From Swiss-Prot:
The gene is cinA. Transmembrane segments: none annotated. SUPFAM superfamilies: CinA-like (SSF142433), Molybdenum cofactor biosynthesis proteins (SSF53218). This is Putative competence-damage inducible protein. It comes from the Bacteria. Belongs to the CinA family. It comes from Streptococcus equi subsp. zooepidemicus (strain H70). InterPro entries: CinA, CinA-like_C, CinA_C, CinA_KH, Competence-induced_CinA, MoaB/Mog-like_dom_sf, MoaB/Mog_dom. CDD domains: cinA (cd00885).
């Protein structure tokens, strides 16, 4: 089924509001296995709206109109669609009762004539009741094309779509099931190159790569009648792609860190720390507390984190962490020595199981003859201290600092998995 979204409202065309409804509806249609091919915005003008509806009806099976259901004269979506379809407008009793209750609550004796427009419905439509507003929506199929009218305010549109529209549409369509795989340590272009043949010849399931700051996700999607069938297809595709090797001969499964739309390296690390019963601390220089801030975003962070340090200057590294100033000056702030000492001292001072040290050059200028983007990350446990050097080139200060924390979380994650013989 091909769908088209039509946003009605001059305020969209003038930039007064952002059309967030289009994104929401596109996501919902995708979940239902309905392909959105076109999105259009049109002002509050009957002639132009008639033209847009006519074009949509010739190329789409499902036409969804949003906005223009209110009580004013420029709210003309239902009236215009009724005119196009040659249908009358009728009064919906349930919506009318809601109007009466609304005005009674406001101590007004009767609804006003213009407000009655909000309870009107195109003759022959299925009513889509409005749980959070007054304007009733509707669904009608004419000559093989299904038309849907929805209110414009997102607070009204979203509940109507979820509770009224989706159940009607889902009864006749296979749903779209998706699985999101999250990778760290590989760029989007490298990942796409590794998966070139799979992506080039894909049909169903499909593979869609997305780049985020410092990481890449793959969305695997399939249309299926039920979850079990979808899982079978997605499992097969995942097994196939994770066995593929990158240009430097790494299997992709070693770069996979988790699943899910809202997952992150910080969350994965946090959950591993909780599961293992281990605690962590950090001493941060260039990241200035960003690592600790991400860790404490999660409820229950106190189970794994007691406290940490922000030691931005060389003097504070010596004073707060007890690292000899002469050694810091000899090795340099931007060095593996300093990162390891920061991690080890922070761990000892807080009696934590794991210590992280972050030091480097956020930029844009170099420091100690080290180019911008140079980062050293130390990791200390009771039995071992190690460090990692990464160069995050061509990035802003903000990106360098954030990506540095991703490398730190990944170090901790891998160390925890190794301790459980899972890596």
């Amino acid at each position: 089924m091909k769908a088209e979204l039509i946003a009605v409202g001059t305020e969209i065309l003038t930039g007064q509001i952002v059309n967030t409804n289009a994104q929401f509806l596109s996501e919902k249609m995708a979940e239902l296995g309905i392909d959105v091919y076109f999105q259009t915005a049109v002002g509050d003008n009957e002639e132009r709206l008639l033209s847009v509806i006519d074009i949509a009806s010739q190329r789409s099976d499902l036409v969804i109109l949003c906005g223009g259901l209110g009580p004013t004269d420029d709210d003309l979506t239902k009236q215009t669609l009724a005119k196009y379809l040659g249908k009358a407008l009728v009064f919906d009793e349930q919506a009318g009762q809601k109007l009466d209750a609304f005005f009674a609550h406001r101590k007004q004796t009767a609804r006003t004539p213009n407000n009655q427009r909000q309870a009107q419905l195109i003759e022959g439509s299925v009513a889509l009741q409005n749980q959070t507003g007054l304007a009733v929506g509707g669904l009608i199929t004419v000559d093989g094309v299904t038309y849907v009218v929805l209110p414009g305010p997102p607070s009204e549109l979203k509940p109507m779509v979820k509770n009224e529209l989706v159940p009607l549409l889902s009864a006749s369509h296979a749903s779209l099931y998706s699985r999101v795989l999250r990778f760290f340590g590989i760029g989007e272009s490298q990942l796409v190159t590794a998966l070139e043949d799979l992506i080039k010849y894909q049909t169903d399931p499909t593979i869609a790569p997305y780049a985020k700051t410092g990481e890449v996700t793959l969305r695997l999607s399939t249309k299926a009648d039920h979850q079990a069938l979808a899982n079978e297809r997605l499992d097969q595709l995942e097994l196939q792609l994770l066995s593929i090797r990158t240009i430097d001969n790494q299997p992709l499964r070693r770069l996979l860190y988790g699943y899910g739309e809202d997952n992150s390296l910080a969350r994965e690390t946090f959950e591993l720390l909780k599961r293992s019963g281990k605690t962590i601390t950090a001493a941060e220089s260039l990241t200035a507390g960003l690592f600790q801030a991400q860790l404490t975003d999660f409820a229950g962070a106190s189970q794994v984190f007691n406290g940490g340090f922000i030691t931005y200057s060389i003097e504070e590294k010596a004073r707060m962490l007890g690292i000899p100033l002469v050694e810091l000056q000899r090795h340099g702030v931007v060095s593996s020595f300093t990162a390891e000492q920061m991690a080890a001292q922070a761990r000892c001072l807080t009696d934590s199981d794991i210590g992280i040290g972050l030091t480097g050059v956020a930029g844009p200028e170099e420091l100690e003859e080290q180019p911008a983007g140079t980062v050293f990350i130390g990791l200390a446990t009771k039995n071992k201290v190690e460090s990692l050097k990464v160069v995050i080139g061509g990035r802003s200060r903000l990106d360098v600092r954030y990506i540095a924390t991703l490398y730190a979380f990944n170090m901790v994650r891998k160390a925890l998995l190794k301790s459980e013989n899972l890596l």
